[in-house]
């Protein structure tokens, strides 16, 4: 009888020891929340690059330092490091930089736990199309977040003037292909492929996705805020 009681007590103590750690791990991953995530993409018919504009309504669930250190600022994934014209479009952004995996954003001031703020930026993304004869195809997945939930996300792909694309998913309104998601869990993605059979120019295969220079390569990006 004593052995049974001792075994039961040891089991309860083990559960009690593990439970706080499990609860803490689950809670610690949710240090931010994204209320709204909007992405607008427009291909350039001359060189095949993508003009991308991203807008966030973001909430800090913990105090968020302004600078991008281990827990400051934010970082958002990009497809590869060959980008140009990276531009901050909102006043709260103090600095914006990139490497092959992320855009890193520093803010002009800290944000307190519970504070909601908005920011946006844009860039031109290169080496994104593939060629199959006269067909031009894009596959694009906006940065996702393994440690942050997203309330609402909209990806809008704008066909260039005079060109009509076929999207792999979502709804099409005129020349806009719209893909939406709500209540996105950790790590959930919103990929979209768009194919053009009537591209008006001859794009150079040298600048296609298949020929991305090794110095810009990013075979996998795991997006999260810092």
Tell me the role of every PLM-derived stretch.
Residues 23-226:
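Lumenal/extracellular ectodomains and adaptor appendage modules
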Residues 9-21:
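Bacterial N-terminal signal peptides
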Residues 1-5:
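Positively charged n-region of N-terminal signal peptides that target proteins for export
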């Amino acid at each position: 009888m004593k052995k049974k009681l001792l075994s039961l007590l040891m089991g309860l103590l083990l559960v009690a020891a593990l439970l706080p750690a499990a609860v803490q791990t689950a809670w610690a991953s949710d240090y931010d929340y994204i209320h709204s995530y909007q992405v607008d993409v427009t291909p350039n018919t001359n060189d095949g690059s993508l003009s991308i504009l991203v807008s966030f309504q973001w909430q800090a669930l913990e105090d968020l330092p302004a600078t991008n250190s281990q827990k400051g600022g934010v970082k958002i994934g990009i497809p590869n490091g060959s980008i140009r014209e990276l531009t901050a479009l909102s006043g709260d952004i103090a600095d914006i930089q990139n490497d092959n995996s992320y855009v890193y954003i520093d803010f002009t001031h800290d944000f307190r736990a519970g504070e909601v703020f908005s920011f946006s930026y844009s860039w031109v993304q290169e080496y994104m199309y593939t060629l199959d004869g006269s067909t031009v195809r894009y596959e694009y997945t906006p940065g996702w977040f393994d440690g942050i939930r997203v309330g609402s996300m909209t990806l809008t792909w704008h066909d260039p003037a005079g060109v009509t694309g076929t999207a792999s998913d979502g709804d099409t309104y005129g020349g806009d292909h719209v893909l939406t998601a709500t209540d996105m869990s950790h790590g959930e993605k919103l990929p979209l492929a768009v194919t053009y059979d009537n591209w008006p120019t001859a794009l150079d295969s040298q600048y296609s996705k298949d020929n991305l220079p090794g110095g810009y390569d990013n075979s996998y990006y795991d997006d999260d805020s810092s």
